[in-house]
Amino acid sequence: MRTLVMVACAVSLAACSSPPKPPTVSGRHRIPINSPAAQEELRLQVFPQEPTAQATMWPARPPKQTVNVYFPQDVTVFRPTSAQINQLHTLLWPVPKHINVRGLTDNNCPPPGDTQVARVRALAIYNWLINQGVPASRITISYAPVKDYASNAPLSPGRVLNRRVDIEILRK
C-alpha cells in the first residue's frame, strides 16, 4: 500500500512539473503599426479631442448681454410673462460666469422712496434667478433711484422705460 501511494505521488509530481505547451500564434490579430488607421488611433490616444457635442448644444453667444425687465409704477413684485421666462431661460443656460442686477426707477417719488423701490425690484429679480438655479455667488445687485435714464421724457410713456431692472449677463 505504501508503495502504491509513493508511486501515485511521484506520478502526480512529475505531471505538475512539466512545462506548459507554448501558445500557437496565428497572426490573424496583427495590426500593421505604420498603417494610417494605427497612426490616427495613436494620435487620438496621445492628443484626445474635446467633445464637440456641447459646442453644438449651445450656440456661440456674445460675452455680454443685457435684458431689461420693466415694472409698473410703484410695483416691486416680479411676475414674469411666459415670453420673459423663455428669454431669460435661453440666456441663463448654460449658467453664465456672472450676472449684474441693477434696479432703477423713474424718479417719481422722493429719493428715499425711489431707492427702496429700486432695491426691492432688484431683490425680486435676484430671488427669481436663484430659484431658477443660478448660484448666488455669481449674482451682484445694485440699485439707484436716479441713474442711467433710458428716456428723459417727463411724460408717462417715457418714464415707463426708466422703471426697470437691467440684468447684465457676462459670459467671460
Curated annotation (Swiss-Prot):
SUPFAM superfamilies: OmpA-like (SSF103088). A lipid is attached at residue 16 (S-diacylglycerol cysteine). It is a lipid-anchor. Keywords: Cell outer membrane, Lipoprotein, Membrane, Palmitate, Signal, Virulence. It is found in: Cell outer membrane. The keyword Translocase does not apply. InterPro entries: OmpA-like (IPR006665), OmpA-like_sf (IPR036737). GO terms for cellular component: cell outer membrane. Transcription is turned on at the beginning of the stationary phase of vegetative growth. The virB operon is essential for intracellular survival and is not involved in the invasion process. Constitutes a major determinant of virulence in mice. This protein is essential for pathogenesis in mice but is not required for intracellular survival. This is Type IV secretion system putative outer membrane lipoprotein BAB2_0057. The lineage of its organism: Bacteria, Pseudomonadati, Pseudomonadota, Alphaproteobacteria, Hyphomicrobiales.
